[in-house]
Amino acid sequence: MNAAIIDTLEKRETTFKKNLKDSNGKVFEIAETTKIGESSIYRLWTKDQSYYYTSKAKKTQICLHFTVGSITGDIATLTKPGNKVSVHYVVDRLGNIYNLIPLNKEKNWSYHLGAKCIGTNGVMSKSAIGIEISNYGPLNKHADGYYNAYKQLYCVEDRHVENILFRNYNYYSRMTEAQKTAVYELVNWLCEQCDIPHNYKLEGMFENDKCAQEFTGIFTHAQVRKDKFDLPYAQVKYIKEMWEESLLPPEPVKKDEPVKTEDITFAEIRKNVEKSTTSIKTMAKKEPTPVKEDKPWYVEILGMITGLFAKIKN
């Protein structure tokens, strides 16, 4: 049996971060690193920047995708020269965030929603910042494990899978905690950078083109494409829940109750002090009780014998 893909992913991601080489052999450089919360954004740079447009495109939305692949292939596909199909960010399982298209809320974009997109691909791809989550997506369960869309063994253990019924699939690849944290922090950071409100459309389709185009906030690919599987609501609802939780007021700090003391006047305090002082003086004037000296044991016996002889004589 071939090794399960899940067992190779951490090594692939660690190797890519070290040598920055995609599956086509193209090597990148890290032009800039931006720290956001616990996560970091790495701006990947290569001489060929022909995979995106630099024309005007005002950002009002964020769209979440998953790649159905692993990081080296994901980067290669999304930076294919002249293809103009890409996204701004890719988040791997280790929580690394790679920036492919320079962020500018007024320009820089690439197609990422497809021809069947509600709202039209041209309009929505310009207004929506794309985030790809490096993840294999829907899985099929077999006797020996779970298989991906390419009919490859993804994993054997259930812990790598989420049991989610969504669009005719029952199982989906589980996101790592580091990945979930990075996606959440990236979404919040982008909302701040581009003045995008925290409105969430994470389930159900947009009714029509107008609704999709006028929406401002965060949605997933599945909200504009009925033929897509990225992403099930159960996998992304945590983003909305964590944001709403962050808005709650902090719980009040419980302070220790003050120690209750009886009310006492100054006159009473003075009286008690004087009483204590008098008692001390009285004790000092008393003569000490003489200490009885211990006598040797034989002295007492001799005294008893002497007394006995005295009685006999009498």
Task: Please place each PLM-identified region on the residue numbering.
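Active-site-adjacent loop/helix surface patches within enzyme catalytic domains
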Residues: E29-E192, I196
